[in-house]
Amino acid sequence: MVVIGHSQACLVALELNRILKKSLEALIFVAGSNEIPVNQFLLDLSKENPQKASQMMVTWGHGIDGDMSINKWPGHSHYGEGNNIMCMNKSTALRYDLHSCNDYSDGIDAAKIIKVPALAVLAKNDQMTPLKSGLKFVELIKNCETHILDCGHFLPSERPMELNSIINSFLSKLK
């Protein structure tokens, strides 16, 4: 089994490694870190005005390509898509997610015990899980192939072809 996580799901992947050690073949971390501290303003806003908080995150999360006028998908708005997806969640989901990220404290120990091959794909312009934090994270993992893409936090939508190519290459080495 290969577990892949993006952002907060990287913290979940760290914990799954503890639980499923014997079943795992590899771990893939996309725009992740071993810790994801959250600004108090955003934590408060996620309770008071979750829609505004999610709109801010969608804007921060995208790199320069997030704007419809300059992204690689003509006519596509990453901001619009992101906001539509966030509106599908329960109003309390973002608050709980942000608090879970902020409260998670076992990332260093969890990263150090990874024994399976790992892949980390980080983003140069990530404002949600900054590159500096991601690079410190991968240093904790003994066997971690690392790539950095020139985009923001939402690599799967900002650089889908590049991300898929990197993941496919990594997975092909496992066979």
Where on the chain are the PLM-derived regions?
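Core-facing hydrophobic residues within beta-strands of well-ordered domains
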Residues: 24-25, 141-144
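Conserved alpha/beta-hydrolase catalytic His-Asp/Glu region
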Residues: 38-113
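Residue-level signal for the nucleotide or nucleotide-sugar donor/cofactor binding architecture
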Residues: 89, 129-132, 158
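Short beta-strand/loop motif that positions the catalytic acidic residue
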Residues: 114, 120-122, 126
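Short alpha-helix in the alpha/beta-hydrolase fold that links the catalytic acid
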Residues: 116, 130-139
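Catalytic active-site module of serine/aspartate enzymes centered on a nucleophile-bearing elbow/loop
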Residues: 144-175
